[in-house]
């Protein structure tokens, strides 16, 4: 039952909340899609944190999407141990860069008084949720090696089943709890946006 809730109900619920909430926000408060600009209040930490965060996370998300869309090619790519090791090291490095950038952005929001003055509780909730998700990804990369390979045989078929509106939570059942939490956390982030 829990597997059905976590891997069949929550994903659809998260997407529904994101779509309906997005429409509602657009109609009621169009400026709620981003936090207030704080660039003029402090720009040095913003630059280093923002660049690190965006470059790191966009590359990591790109790899997740490429493996999801081109799963056969991805499986072939990581079947070679040298390429697998290389991708794993690059992925871990990028996730650390993203995490450090996000940590800098969070610290900036909390420490710089002028920036803290325009920080909303939702800004902090979102930043902490993002940091948690990246930290879980780092934990998985360090503790459950070769995610580039097993992702394509577990999470990808599960995500494909969701897209086909025929959820198959059994693909996720055998995965470690931390991986399950990372997968559910991804959908909770979708709901937050």
Functional labels for PLM-detected ranges:
Residues 11-15, 21-22, 37-193:
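Membrane-embedded alpha-helical bundles of multi-pass integral membrane proteins
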């Amino acid at each position: 039952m829990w597997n059905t809730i976590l891997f069949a109900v929550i994903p659809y619920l998260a997407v529904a909340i994101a779509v309906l909430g997005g429409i509602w926000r657009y109609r009621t408060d169009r400026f709620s899609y981003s936090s207030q600009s704080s660039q003029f209040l402090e720009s040095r930490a913003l630059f280093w944190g923002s660049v690190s965060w965006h470059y790191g996370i966009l590359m990591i998300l790109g790899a997740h999407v490429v493996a999801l869309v081109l799963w056969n090619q991805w499986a072939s790519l990581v079947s070679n141990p040298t390429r697998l090791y290389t991708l794993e090291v690059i992925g871990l490095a990028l996730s650390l860069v993203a995490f450090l950038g996000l940590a800098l952005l969070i610290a900036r929001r909390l420490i710089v008084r002028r920036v803290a003055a325009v920080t909303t509780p939702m800004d902090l909730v979102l930043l902490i949720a993002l940091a948690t998700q990246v930290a879980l990804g780092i934990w998985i990369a360090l503790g459950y090696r070769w995610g580039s390979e097993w992702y394509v045989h577990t999470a990808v078929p599960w995500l494909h089943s969701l897209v086909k509106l025929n959820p198959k939570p059994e693909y996720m059942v055998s995965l470690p709890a931390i991986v399950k939490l990372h997968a559910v956390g991804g959908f909770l982030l979708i709901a937050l946006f």
